[in-house]
Amino acid sequence: RMEPVDSLERNAETGRFLVRTPSAAYDAAAVIVSAGAQPRKAGFVGEERYAGHGVSYCATCDGMFYRGKQVFVIGGGNSAAEEALFLTRFASKVTVVVRKDHLRAQASVVSELERSEKVELRLMTSIVELGGGELPSSITFRDNATGETHVETYEEGSFGVFVLVGRVPESGLLRGLVELDESGYAVTDE
C-alpha cells in the first residue's frame, strides 16, 4: 500500500515512530525516508508559466525535444556544465548563462565547454524574464555588472531554457527528528 505521509513523529520515551497518512496512523520501530529532492527554481518571471513548455529542469529528460533549436542553460556548477555539454548533441547552439564572473564547474568540464563550437558562455548575466504566447518567444537578460537589461526575441517555440541551479531536498518531514545541514539535507556519517 502506498500513501502520502502527512507527518512523522518520534516518541522520546520508546524511540518508536508514528507515521500519519490521510487514512491511518502507523507505529514503526524504524522508518526509511527516500523523499528525494526537487530542482531549485531560478526565480525569473515566466519560469512557472513556461515550465514544461519551454522551461525544463533535466537535459537528459528533455534535451531531444530541442533538436536543431537553441537552448539556454542557467547555472555554473558541474551539473549545469555537464548537461550543457550533453545538450550539444541535440541543440544547434547552447548558451550557458552564469550569474557570476566564472563557472564553479571542474576545470576540465569548463575547458570542454570553451572548446565547443556550439557553446557560448554569458558570464555575469541573469535571465530575468521569459515572455511570449503559448510558448516563449523572448528573453530579458540582466548584465549583473551594470544592472542593465536587454530583450532578445525569437520565433515562438524555437528555443528552450534549462534551469540547472541545484536541488532542494524534500526533508520537511525530518525537521526536528534528525540533524539537517544549512541546505536541508540530512547529516550522515558517510
Describe each model-derived feature in a short phrase:
Residues 84-85:
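Generic hydrophobic/aromatic pocket-lining and core-packing "Φ" positions
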